């Protein structure tokens, strides 16, 4: 691709992003309002806290508990591939170019040449992604409210032309300063539904739920039953919990690079229909256990469009993140863990310290 075409593409991407309406007054956005959220602050971690559940990493007992799960001295990575044909929510898209062939050189007596890459994307909210403090909020009469009572109008960092260039106190770098070292509990919902006789032996994934009661919704009772059935110790303070629904297998890291464009398009179609995942009762239960992180193999980890309480938009997101500062990792490759027989391990990862970003890409490691 010629550089002139490259930069036209970049500018077009940036221009499309600027089309979103920006509201600057200190008031609610048009649409639904929930002022119950105004009672959620201050956080249990203190009124000035910006890291939420990453504070569990400061507890040496949590690190010791995580490391105690390592029995075989083996490691796995559970991030998926970043690529233009991989699924993305809504308009989110990964675009990457190599500017120049090569980008620079040759230089010096050794005739050195090099390549760079240029990426345009929603860097914190694409493919395997971590949701940080600035990602999910609730519309209130005071304006959009995020973790620990921060109103977005008051948070924004602005640059030239008053353009918002960062989330200020809600930036993901605050979580990145601490990161996560936690005992990982892997819940295999596919095996569990099969054991109940609710899913065929040949099925690889839970169905997309459409209404309350569908088996694609994992409830609080289901979580507790899976822990017991898998012979695991109870989920406790500072633990991280991964849910395997099987839907992520459609573009798992072990198969994505061998898929052709038609297969990748089919995976994107499944991804766009909805997803099995946690019901709101499961998230409330996990919050009561004081966990550090939820994760799973789908785009949100919330069951949708069907959930236990209908009419809410990905309710675990606001219940866990906005209300409690318990963060969420999406599109994790749980298939790799299931194939290796990993039900428990040490999860180690930290988001990139992108100042003001809403989230972070990443490739976490699990030691077991």
Task: Indicate residue ranges for each PLM-predicted region.
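Active-/binding-site microenvironments in catalytic and ligand-binding cores
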Residues: 21-368
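Fungal secretory targeting signals
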Residues: 1-20
């Amino acid at each position: 691709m010629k550089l002139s075409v490259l930069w036209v593409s970049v500018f077009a991407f940036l221009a499309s992003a600027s089309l979103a309406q920006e509201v600057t007054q200190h008031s609610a956005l048009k649409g639904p309002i929930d002022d119950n959220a105004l009672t959620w602050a201050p956080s249990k971690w203190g009124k000035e806290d910006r890291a939420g559940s990453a504070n569990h990493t400061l507890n040496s007992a949590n690190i010791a508990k995580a490391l105690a799960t390592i029995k075989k001295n083996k490691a796995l990575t559970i991030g998926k591939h970043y690529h233009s044909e991989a699924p993305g929510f809504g308009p989110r898209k990964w675009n990457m170019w190599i500017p120049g062939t090569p980008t620079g050189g040759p230089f010096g007596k050794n005739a050195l040449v090099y390549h760079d890459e240029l990426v345009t994307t929603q860097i914190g909210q694409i493919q395997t992604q971590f949701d940080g403090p600035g990602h999910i909020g609730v519309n209130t009469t005071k304006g959009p409210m995020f973790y620990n009572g921060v109103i977005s109008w008051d948070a924004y960092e602005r640059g030239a032309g008053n353009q918002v260039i960062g989330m200020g106190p809600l930036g993901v770098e605050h979580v990145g300063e601490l990161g996560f070292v936690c005992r990982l509990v892997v819940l295999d919902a596919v095996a569990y539904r099969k054991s109940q006789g609710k899913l065929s032996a040949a099925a690889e994934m839970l169905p997309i739920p459409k209404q309350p009661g569908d088996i694609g919704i994992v409830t609080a009772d289901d979580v507790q039953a899976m822990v017991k059935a898998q012979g695991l110790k109870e989920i406790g303070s500072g633990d991280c919990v991964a849910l395997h629904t099987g839907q992520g297998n459609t573009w798992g890291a072990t198969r994505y690079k061998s898929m052709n464009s038609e297969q990748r398009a089919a995976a994107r179609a499944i991804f766009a229909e909805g997803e099995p995942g946690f019901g709101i009762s499961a998230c409330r239960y996990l919050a009561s256990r004081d966990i550090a992180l939820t994760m799973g193999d789908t785009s949100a980890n919330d069951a949708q469009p069907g959930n236990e309480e209908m009419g809410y938009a990905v309710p675990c997101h606001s219940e866990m993140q906005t209300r409690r500062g318990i963060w969420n990792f999406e599109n994790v490759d749980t298939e790799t863990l299931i194939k290796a027989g990993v039900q428990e391990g040490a999860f180690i990862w930290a988001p990139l310290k992108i100042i003001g970003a809403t989230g972070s890409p990443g490739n976490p490691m699990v030691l077991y």
